[in-house]
Amino acid sequence: MSYIEKKGNIFNSKAMAIVNTVNCVGAMGKGIALDFKLRYPEMFKEYQKICFQHLLKPGQILPYKKSTPIILNFAIKDDWKDPSKVEWIEETLQKFVNNYNRLGITSIAFPWIGAMNGGIPLETIKYLTRKYLSDLDGIDIEVYDFDPDAPCVLYNTLKDIVEANALSPSELEDMSDIKARYWVKIIDAVKDSNTKSINNLCHYIVDGKRIIGKTNIERLFDFLTKYNKGIYIEPKSLF
């Protein structure tokens, strides 16, 4: 099978499983974990419930099989405020190596686990990742170097909506619960050639302030996910 390192957006992967990195206190407030929380809210609820029961410990892997792709939550921190530890990262990698066949996983996408908010040097993470994952049988492995400019399916959907110009900010408000005045800002940001991804949009600054806050980011992800599935709140009737 194959082992590939690439730059891009891990959420574009076609792999049957994808790895998220988490703490053990039920918080997904930043980094790749926040992206997972926004894209898979039901997974987050299940993870949080297990954390609140004190069942998840550093070095363990929490699978979530109700989504496509399957999500493997690698617990590489105890508390979100604290750094990760190399031994916890190694423990999760070893557990994965010992169990991927049993789980039936034949393809998977990894981030550089622990390199962004884990506080572990990237070269250390690369060494460990290659040590455990680069020569496995019966599985295709992708390891993603995060590219903040790489678009994803959700951003492409948003861009298509903006470029089609078929829905007014007021209609989009009715469909998403994001106020029309924020939709105006979102639309303007998407039209900016410097905006290439959801990540860019979430950090888009106007007059020293981000145009979209936490609540509206959650609503935007929810709207775009439902829009792609053809499931969303219909615009209010004219009658």
Region annotations inferred by a language model:
Residues 1-239:
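Macrodomain-like recognition of ADP-ribose-binding/processing modules
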